[in-house]
Amino acid sequence: MNILVITKSAWDDRIASGNTLSNFFEGWNEVNFSCLYSRDAEPNNNICKEYYSISPISIFKHFFKPSKIGRRFIYDPQGSHSSDSEKEAKMINTAKRNKSIFEIIYHLAYATNFWKNESFKKFIADCNPDIVFCFGQSDPLTYRAVKYVKQNTTAKIISYYVDDLYRANASVFNIGQKLKNYYLKQIAQMSDLCYAICQRMCDEYKDLYGRPFRLLHKGCDISQPKTTVNSPIKFVYAGNLFYHRDMILGALAKAIDKVNNGDQKARLDIYSGTSVNDEVLSMLNIKGTSTLHEARPFEEIKQIMRESDIVLHVESFDKEQMKRVRLSFSTKITDCMQSGSMMMAIGPDAVASIDYASSIPGCIVVNNLDDLVNTIQGLMDCNTTIIENAVKTNKFAKENVELNQLRNRLKSEFKALL
């Protein structure tokens, strides 16, 4: 079976989307993977070797020589890296400050279709995909590449909707959002099988897109539950800092610092690849209490989470951010469940992931930031609660989200399409 993965970001285990792909597909024997993506950043995984990168930089750089657009390569961890990846990182940081303008430029780059050159067509032909797996996202390359494959091959299309990106009430003047809505709907319409990350999303998207959706979220390679508690107590968050999650972690760091009261009774370690400004850096780095670390390989993150006492999932209470993530089921929840540590979720229960966390035995859910100090103090005063809760969550994970069960189910459903 040949599977072509089409995605926006590089297949990198250190970021959420890449980690999800590896969680699904690692250990699939007799399957050939290839990946098409719209960034210059290098991949980082043990599954896929063959790649084709079509970044906006490449399109504009070779605007008058379209035959040079795109980069096909075999991934080699020790090999040379793209000279444009550093430029791209700087461009993305600039784009965040001028989002509207850069979104227009980004969409126009792929609208030219100059990237559909002979190199691209040969890559698709050589991949000879039986199945295309893509995220249900508003990325223009994803939509246009899926459409090309649908029209020019016999491959079955499988889409996976993770983030709630559709905006039903977009203004008639908001052309950018209207276009995103169109891409999202068209990807679903072109799909032979659609997945969504939470049941609430499955139900709503069935009505929205007129297609049935199946529930799918990451599986757990489950560790044994904790038997001892560290001193100081270790809180760990590993994930992106988008959607004001940085603000929630800042509030948590402040609460831990208040409970510590000059002694190091607990500490918070944050691991993220998200770029932050000096204000956020200062908020998340409190001497003796909290530290923001750079992203680490997922295998290292798993070990860090296993060695922690309390693993975290957080969402913002800001109304605009709640709208953005209301149907999202964070991949961090399964990462937390597999760690063997106690799980804590902070956020409003109107968000699907927090609502789900409330149903996990042993998971402490904080729905009001004013309760943080008392919650932390209670855990410090009774360490056995951490052990007891870790055991409860571990039992639930083994019964409901075991990794091999998930992979076997996925492989079976993929084969059933052929």
Where are the predicted features?
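Acidic anion/phosphate-binding donor-loop and adjacent secondary structure
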Residues: 167, 172, 207, 214-233
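Nucleotide-activated donor-binding/catalytic signature segment of Leloir-type glycosyltransferases, i.e.
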Residues: 272, 278-307
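A charged, aromatic-enriched C-terminal amphipathic alpha-helix characteristic of glycosyltransferases
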Residues: 367-374, 384-415
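Nucleotide-sugar-dependent
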Residues: 244-247, 301, 311-334, 343-355
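Conserved donor-binding/catalytic core segment of Leloir-type glycosyltransferases
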Residues: 228-249, 253
